[in-house]
Curated annotation (Swiss-Prot):
Family: Belongs to the triosephosphate isomerase family.
GO BP annotation list: gluconeogenesis; glycolytic process
Protein name per Swiss-Prot or TrEMBL: Triosephosphate isomerase, cytosolic
Induction remark: By water stress.
Key words, A-Z: Cytoplasm, Gluconeogenesis, Glycolysis, Isomerase, Stress response
Additional observations: In plants, there are two types of TPIS, cytosolic and plastid.
Subunit details: Homodimer.
EC number: 5.3.1.1
Organism: Pinus pinaster
Length: 17
């Protein structure tokens, strides 16, 4: 889902929004 993609992207960046 879109949420998962967004979650992974932020996690990889190291900045949880």
């Amino acid at each position: 889902t879109f949420d998962v993609c967004y979650e992974q992207l932020f996690f990889v960046g190291g900045n949880w929004k």
